[in-house]
Structure formats: structure tokens, C-alpha cells
């Protein structure tokens, strides 16, 4: 056993020389594990684990929105091992870290200085290696399970939006954000084969002539029958520009068909559109790398097809959980020509940003209405707040979710990732909507009747109570308002709810079809915005 004195010297040295003996250990590639592990045990790499923990601890201590000492998060991370074996407990007292297994002391190690990230990473690894000798559950847990337990512990006392994703989950997250190499289909499993239910536009699948109802039987000669969705997706996806050959059965044909295509960069569809009586209604489901481009394309095509008969735009953000901040900025910029869109403020220098509009308003000055509800969050709230504060849109619905924080993604050496809160969002009028949300000018909370008369009644009631609505909006947009009871009362003025019916869309159409009415509704927030200066 290594003595406490030697351990203390080792962890203190880590801040000066990196991981202890790392250059030598790299050459030997985990010498302690050269012998095969005992039956049931899993291989645990000291070098890899220390590297992963150091990267995670460093990212959290440097970038989290509030200061967090490395020692504090490391202790919480070690406590997280209890998720694998509840008999494992740890305490930190008198400069020592003590590990217990079922109440019995297993080891007592000297703690590094609180800010020594590398030292705490090395200590965490040594605690785990020692704990594996005392815990069958930990011996048989793979490294990913250990990482998950530790980082869940590390993040347990931070905000609810900071979280860890293992390598597999992180891969899926990156596909949602950044797209993936694929062919552009949606499918479900029917009779043990993938049945195509949708072909995405402008994708290899569309170009190759794939159609709804086709059943894929083979991909590059590999039978697909009986495979699960994950296995099928892993076969269909691959590096962009790589070739894939599909064999399929098509309704109405007896012989199998073979088609070949090259994979392309595929983005999940986030934009859908319909046009009713000259009003363009665009639903934005989330914000990924392709959202702003897709929205711009929809708006330009709508303008080309409608010409001067285009009356206005409804941007439906209900149920939109958010996504990429820069995409929300670009979406806002499509409808604004000047002024601030949003600012972000955090502890790390790179988290402080001021985003300004400089677009060309693809709605051409026509009325814009934004629909929000209690599930409109994050990037969706950025768009709603920017268009409302810049007097460009009337916001209709319920108070939004109130996720006014920004997360950065820390990619770890194991290909997992930590999503970490590192800044707060500040609306152009100066208020922070974290825990508060965006307040619609026309509130539909608790309204259940979808009739057209109900839409007119709500508009009439809001406009007749103009002073009350404006007083609420002035209080809502008070910069620096942190009093939780006041913020709660403000949210109660328009309770956050999930809205999926057509009432909000009917109100939007009423406003767009009556320019004078739209202007009166817009002035509800425009006047309160001016009152702040």
C-alpha cells in the first residue's frame, strides 16, 4: 500500500508535472493490467481514467457559471460510486479522503490542494482502483458505468441543466445537433424489416427514387431482417460520400430492387410550413445546425409563390425545447435588420457575447406573430424575446419555460460529453428570463374553447385591460429583478402551460388579417419597452 505521505507528495506534484509518471506509463500502456483480469472483472485503465477525470474536472472548474473547487466536485464524484455499490461511502476530513466499504475503512489518502485538478483526478482514479478490490459490483462494472457514476456525482450539486452523457448517448446528441452521414429516410419496423414512412427532401434517398412503403431487406449485402433500430441505423449511417447499396421490396412489384447511393450530411428536419389564406405558418420544432438555413429557404419560397398576397408570418415555437444558441440568433436575424438580439453573461471570458442583428427581414416588414407555451425553452425563448423586445412581433400563448441559461458542451477523451451551464441569457430590454420566461402580450393560459369567437374575446379583453397588461410587462422586464416571490407572482399572471390546440393560431390570424388590430397588440409591448429607457 502507498503511504499517505507518498500520496500527498504525488498529488501535489501533479499540478506541476501533469499526471504522475504519465510519460512512462504511456510507454508501458497500463503495466498493472498486463495480466488478464480475473473472471467477472472488467479491465480498468489508470491512464485513461485519470485523463478523462482531469478533462472533466478542469472543464467544470473553469467554465461552470459559478465557482466550484475541484476538491468539492471530486468528492461528490467519488460519492457517485454509491450508484454502483451502495455500500461504498466516502468522507473528507482533516485533509484526508476516507473510503469505506460497508462501514469498514478501505483506504485513507491525503487530499491534494482544493484547486489541484490533476491531483484530484489522480486521487479519484486511485480511490476507484482500491474500491474495486473491496466491491464485486465495482469490479464487474465497465469503465463507462464508472464514468457515468462519477460524473453524475460531480454534477449532482450543480444546476439541473448540467449533465453527463456517455459515448453512445453523446454520439446521438451530436447527430441531433450537427447532423450525420446517412441517406435521408424515416422508417419503422414492420414484419421484422425497416418499412420506409418518409423520404426527406434533397437527400440521397430522394435522388435514388426510394419511396414510402418500400421495405429494405439488405444493405451492402447484409440482411436487415430481425435487426433492431440501433443495429439498422448503424448499418445505414456512415461517413459522408461513402457508397451504400440497398435491396428493397416495393409494393406492386414481385422482384427485389437494388439501388445505390452515396451517403450525405443529413440534418433532422426542424422546420415545417403551411400557408393559409396568404398567412405563412412555420413550425420550428428545435434548433439544429440547419434550422436557420431551412427557415430562410421556406420564407423565400413563400414570398416567391405568394408575392404581394403574402399577409404575414406565424412562427410557432410551442413545444420547442431549444437547441443551438447561434441558430436562434440567426433565426432572429432573418426577421430583424438592426438592434441587439441577445447577450450572454458568465464567469468564463468566452461565455460573454453580444449578438446584434444585421439581416434583411425575410418577412419584408409584414406582421409577425410568435406562439409560445410552457415547453418553449432556451433557444426558442431567445427568438421570442428578441422579436418582442425589438417590436417586431406579437407574442401569443403562455409564459415560456424560463430556461434562460446557456450550456457549453465539453467533449471528453472517452468520447462522452458534459453539457455544462456557463452563462445566463439577457434579453435586449435587459431582463434575464432564467426562471421567469418570456411573457406573451396576449395570454391564453387556461383558455379551452377553440372557437373563433373565443379568439376575438381574448384579444378584446387584453386590449380593454391595456394598462394592467402593460404594468405586468414593465415589471416583467425590469433589469436585475432577482426577487423570487415577485418573479413567481409575475409568472402567475400568465401561468406556464402546454398548449397544442388551434386557439393561438386563430388569434394570430385575427391579428394578421386586421393590420390596425395587430398594431394595437404590438404596442402593448412596444410601449413598455420604451418605458425602460
What are these language model-derived features?
Residues 17-29:
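Bacterial N-terminal signal peptides
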Residues 144, 149-151, 156-198:
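PDZ/PDZ-like peptide-tail recognition elements
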Residues 56-62, 131, 205-228, 314-316:
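Conserved PDZ fold ligand-binding element
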Residues 157, 192-195, 217-219, 231-271, ...:
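PDZ-domain C-terminal substructure recognizer with occasional recognition of PDZ-binding tails
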Residues 177-181, 189-193, 210-211, 238-242, ...:
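Short flexible coil/turn linkers enriched for glycine and charged/polar residues
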Residues 31-34, 41-57, 267-533:
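C-terminal "post-core" interaction segments
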Residues 4-20:
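Bacterial N-terminal signal peptides that target proteins for export
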Residues 30-162, 471-533:
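Terminal targeting/pro-maturation regions of precursor/exported proteins
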Amino acid at each position: 500500500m502507498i503511504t499517505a505521505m507518498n500520496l500527498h507528495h504525488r498529488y501535489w506534484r501533479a499540478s506541476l508535472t501533469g499526471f504522475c509518471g504519465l510519460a512512462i506509463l504511456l510507454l508501458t500502456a497500463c503495466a498493472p493490467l498486463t495480466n488478464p483480469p480475473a473472471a467477472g472483472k472488467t479491465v480498468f485503465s489508470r491512464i485513461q481514467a485519470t485523463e478523462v477525470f482531469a478533462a472533466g474536472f478542469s472543464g467544470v472548474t473553469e467554465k461552470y457559471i459559478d465557482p466550484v473547487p475541484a476538491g468539492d466536485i471530486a468528492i461528490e464524484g467519488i460519492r457517485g460510486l454509491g450508484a454502483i455499490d451502495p455500500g461504498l461511502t466516502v468522507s473528507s476530513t482533516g485533509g484526508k479522503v476516507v473510503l469505506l466499504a460497508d462501514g469498514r475503512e478501505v483506504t485513507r489518502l491525503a487530499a491534494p490542494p482544493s484547486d489541484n485538478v490533476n491531483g484530484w483526478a489522480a486521487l479519484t482514479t486511485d480511490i476507484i482502483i482500491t474500491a474495486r478490490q473491496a466491491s464485486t459490483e465495482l469490479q464487474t462494472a465497465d469503465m463507462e458505468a464508472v464514468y457515468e457514476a462519477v460524473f453524475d456525482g460531480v454534477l449532482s450539486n450543480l444546476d439541473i441543466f448540467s449533465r453527463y452523457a456517455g459515448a453512445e448517448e453523446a454520439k446521438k446528441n451530436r447527430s441531433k445537433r450537427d447532423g450525420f452521414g446517412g441517406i435521408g429516410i424515416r422508417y419503422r419496423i414492420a414484419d421484422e424489416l425497416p418499412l420506409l414512412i418518409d423520404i426527406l427532401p434533397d437527400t440521397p434517398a430522394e435522388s435514388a427514387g426510394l419511396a414510402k412503403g418500400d421495405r429494405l431487406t439488405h444493405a451492402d449485402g447484409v440482411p436487415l431482417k430481425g435487426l433492431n433500430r440501433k443495429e439498422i441505423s448503424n448499418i445505414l449511417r456512415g461517413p459522408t460520400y461513402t457508397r451504400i447499396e440497398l435491396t428493397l421490396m416495393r409494393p406492386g412489384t414481385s422482384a427485389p430492387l437494388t439501388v445505390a447511393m452515396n451517403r450525405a450530411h443529413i440534418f433532422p428536419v426542424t422546420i415545417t410550413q403551411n400557408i393559409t389564406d396568404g398567412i405563412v405558418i412555420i413550425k420550428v420544432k428545435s434548433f439544429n445546425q440547419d434550422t436557420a438555413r431551412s427557415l430562410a429557404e421556406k420564407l423565400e419560397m413563400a414570398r416567391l409563390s405568394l408575392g404581394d398576397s403574402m399577409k404575414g408570418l406565424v412562427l410557432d415555437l410551442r413545444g420547442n425545447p431549444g437547441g443551438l444558441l447561434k441558430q436562434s440568433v440567426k433565426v432572429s436575424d432573418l426577421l430583424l435588420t438592426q438592434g441587439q438580439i441577445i447577450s450572454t453573461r458568465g464567469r468564463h471570458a468566452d461565455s460573454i457575447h453580444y449578438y446584434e442583428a444585421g439581416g434583411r427581414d425575410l418577412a419584408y416588414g409584414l406582421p409577425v406573430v410568435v406562439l409560445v407555451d410552457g415547453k418553449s425553452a432556451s433557444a426558442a425563448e431567445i427568438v421570442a424575446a428578441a422579436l418582442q423586445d425589438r417590436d417586431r412581433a406579437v407574442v401569443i400563448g403562455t409564459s415560456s419555460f424560463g430556461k434562460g441559461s446557456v450550456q457549453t458542451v465539453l467533449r471528453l477523451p472517452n468520447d462522452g460529453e458534459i453539457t455544462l451551464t456557463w452563462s445566463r441569457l439577457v434579453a435586449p430590454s435587459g431582463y434575464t428570463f432564467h426562471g421567469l420566461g418570456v411573457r406573451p402580450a396576449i395570454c391564453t393560459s387556461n383558455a379551452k374553447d377553440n372557437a373563433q369567437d373565443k379568439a376575438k374575446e381574448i384579444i378584446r379583453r387584453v386590449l380593454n385591460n391595456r394598462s394592467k397588461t402593460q404594468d405586468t410587462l414593465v415589471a416583467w422586464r425590469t433589469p436585475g429583478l432577482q426577487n423570487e416571490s415577485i418573479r413567481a407572482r409575475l409568472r402567475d399572471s400568465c401561468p406556464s402551460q402546454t398548449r397544442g390546440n388551434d386557439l393561438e393560431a386563430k388569434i394570430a390570424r385575427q391579428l394578421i388579417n386586421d393590420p390596425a388590430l395587430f398594431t394595437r397588440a404590438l404596442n402593448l409591448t412596444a410601449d413598455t419597452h420604451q418605458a425602460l429607457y
